[in-house]
C-alpha cells in the first residue's frame, strides 16, 4: 500500500523544515499507528478516534512544540469525527494527516465512512448503497468549512507527479501551524491492495479512475498565502 510513501513524505517535510527535534506525533488505532516505528519524533498513542483530542492537550500544554496527528479515514471521520471536526472548529494549531483508502484496513476491510457507492466490503457484501449505508463523506471539504481551518487539501499517491503535489500540501499544512494560523489538514488518497484484493498496479488504477472521480484532489482552503 501507500502508507510507506505517506510516512516518508511527512518525515521529509519535518526534516526540511527543521522541525524534527521539536515535534510530537499523536497516533490512533489503525494501520497508521505504526508511524512511530519509522519516524524519529516523540509520539503518543491515543485511543481509537481520539488522536486530535490528545493532540489538543499536548499542544495546549506545550504550545512551542510542532504537533501532528496521523490517522486513517475510519479513525478520523467515523469514530473520531467529533474530535476531528471540533479541533478544526476551535482552530487548534495542529497539523492533521488523514489516509483515505475507503476501508478499514487493519481490521479486515469493513465498510468505512469513505467507502464508495457500490464498493463491496466485508460488511457491505452487496456493495455500499444509500438506503442502508448513506453516502461517503468528503472529508477535506467538511474541514475546509470550519472557520478555524487555515489549510485543507486533498492529494493522491497514485503517481509520481501527484506524490510531489502531496508533499507540497503536507508542507503547507505544517506551515499553517508554524505561522499560528489555525488547523492544517491534508487528506491523502491511498491504495489498499490487500483488502481491495488487487495487485498494487490495479489498486493505483482504482485510485485514479474511481476514487479521484468522487474525491477530487485540490486545495479547498488556504489562508497561509495571506499571512506570510
Q: Where in this protein do the model-derived segments appear?
A:
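Short coil/turn segments at beta-strand junctions that form active-site/ligand-binding loops
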Residues: 21-23, 65-66, 93, 180-182
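Glycine-rich ThDP/TPP pyrophosphate-binding loop and its adjacent helix/strand module
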Residues: 78-95, 99, 103-228
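Glycine-rich phosphate/diphosphate-binding loops that line cofactor/substrate pockets in enzymes
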Residues: 17-19, 61-62, 177-178
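Catalytic-loop motifs flanking and including active-site residues across diverse enzymes
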Residues: 2-6, 50-54, 135, 139
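General beta-strand structural signal in soluble alpha/beta enzymes
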Residues: 21-27, 69-70, 96-99, 151-154
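Active-site diphosphate/adenylate-binding microenvironment
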Residues: 1-47
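Thiamine diphosphate
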Residues: 31-105, 168-172
